Swiss-Prot record:
Gene3D superfamilies: Glucose-6-phosphate isomerase like protein, domain 1, Helix hairpin bin. Its main location: plastid. Belongs to the universal ribosomal protein uS2 family. One of its GO terms (molecular function) is structural constituent of ribosome. It comes from the Eukaryota. GO terms for cellular component: chloroplast; mitochondrial small ribosomal subunit. It holds the Pfam family Ribosomal_S2. InterPro entries: Ribosomal_uS2 (IPR001865), Ribosomal_uS2_bac/mit/plastid (IPR005706), Ribosomal_uS2_CS (IPR018130), Ribosomal_uS2_flav_dom_sf (IPR023591). The keyword Plastid applies. This is Small ribosomal subunit protein uS2c. The keyword Plastid applies. It comes from Cyanidioschyzon merolae (strain NIES-3377 / 10D) (Unicellular red alga).
């Protein structure tokens, strides 16, 4: 159970400048201070706990999860927490069609695995250099989903504004979305919104670790 004091200490309550707000976030706001919207942490705690409970139940039934967060503040913690709980992640650039064109993505994953196992000793220097460039690009794009053999059942999104393409693909396929939603975002863009500061690393660390713990709990049931 997440405590409000923990959220406060991590700066989860600090939203964006009031002039940048999305009016749909009004129900989740506590007040405004010095031109900054302050998020209602009572609601954040409730909705975070609700999301954690959902994850635990879903994962206990064998559902798989994809973490998505490609902006610099989110990249490292997304990889760390997804890896810790044994799930998948995208923390660089979202590949358009990753979910809606899964067959093509599978072929790229196959190509990546082939390159990982390739013997480049017999190649010319130019050929080997070209393959290494291709391999490095695929490493950045694919390493978080290298063992993903089907589309995920749940996608956790840091900043639905930034990851709009991923969110739209999830909606098209009926994939459950859980989003960390700041005051400039639309909470209705995801199935389960967690109102929170999506720019501070401490805030993202706290929330994503809570979600990862819920996944681990589900796997232990």
């Amino acid at each position: 159970m997440m405590k409000i004091q923990q959220l406060l200490e991590a700066g989860v309550h600090l939203g964006h400048q009031a002039k940048r707000w999305n009016p749909k976030m009004l129900p989740y706001l506590y007040t405004q201070r010095m031109g900054i919207h302050i998020i209602d942490l009572v609601q954040t705690a409730h909705l975070l706990n609700q999301a954690c409970e959902t994850l635990t139940v879903q994962v206990s039934e064998g559902k798989r999860v994809l973490f998505v967060g490609t902006k610099p503040q989110a990249s490292v913690v997304v990889e760390e927490e997804a890896t810790r709980c044994g799930e998948f992640f995208i923390n660089q650039r979202w590949l358009g069609g990753l979910l809606t064109n899964w067959t093509t993505v599978q072929s790229r994953l196959k190509r990546w695995r082939e390159l990982l196992e390739a013997d480049m000793d017999h190649l010319t220097k130019k050929e080997a250099s070209a393959l290494r460039r291709e391999l490095n690009q695929l490493n950045r794009q694919m390493r978080g989903i290298q063992n993903m053999d089907q589309i995920p059942d749940i996608v956790i999104v840091v900043d639905p504004n930034k990851e709009n393409t991923a969110v739209l693909e999830c909606h098209k396929l009926g994939i459950l979305t859980i989003g960390i939603v700041d005051t400039n975002a639309d909470p209705e863009s995801v199935d389960l919104a967690i109102p929170a500061n999506d720019d501070a690393i401490a805030s993202l660390q706290l929330i994503l670790s809570c979600l990862a713990d819920a996944i681990l709990k589900g796997k232990s049931i």
